[in-house]
């Protein structure tokens, strides 16, 4: 096999992966917990872009409940963001799994 051809293909893959990584910030996912009392929006880089808490979820006597709701919503958003990022990177790499690239 031609080594120059392989090098060109590797450069194309590298460029596609770099482009896909840049686009991760454009991916938007949302998750909620407590029947919508806490909502989290996140991008494909797992950065929280918005967090909303319904006033009904704020009970000074039950701080643990709010903490649990926020934790659950963030974890759900992270899972969705990772899945979306993995799908985006998979498209860029033609389905080749490259450890540590997304998520």
Curated annotation (Swiss-Prot):
Transmembrane segment boundaries: none
- Name the InterPro entries for this protein: YbaB-like_sf, YbaB/EbfC
Q: Where in the cell is it found?
A: Cytoplasm, Nucleoid
- Kindly state one GO CC term assigned in the UniProt record: bacterial nucleoid
Q: Which GO terms describe its molecular function?
A: DNA binding
**Coiled coil start-end:** none
Going by the UniProt record, its keywords in alphabetical order are: Cytoplasm, DNA-binding
Q: Could you tell me which PANTHER family the record lists for this protein?
A: NUCLEOID-ASSOCIATED PROTEIN YBAB
User: Subunit comment for this entry?
Assistant: Homodimer.
Role: Binds to DNA and alters its conformation. May be involved in regulation of gene expression, nucleoid organization and DNA protection.
Q: Which family does it belong to?
A: Belongs to the YbaB/EbfC family.
Q: What is this protein called?
A: Nucleoid-associated protein AnaeK_3694
Q: Which organism is it from?
A: Anaeromyxobacter sp. (strain K)
């Amino acid at each position: 096999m031609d080594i120059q051809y392989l090098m060109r293909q590797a450069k194309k893959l590298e460029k596609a992966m770099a482009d896909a990584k840049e686009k991760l910030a454009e991916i938007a996912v949302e998750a909620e917990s407590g029947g919508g009392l806490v909502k989290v929006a996140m991008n494909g880089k797992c950065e929280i872009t918005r967090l909303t808490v319904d006033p009904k979820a704020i009970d000074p006597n039950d701080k643990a409940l709010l903490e649990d709701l926020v934790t659950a919503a963030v974890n759900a958003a992270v899972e969705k963001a990772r899945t979306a990022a993995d799908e985006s990177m998979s498209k860029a790499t033609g389905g080749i799994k490259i450890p540590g690239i997304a998520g």
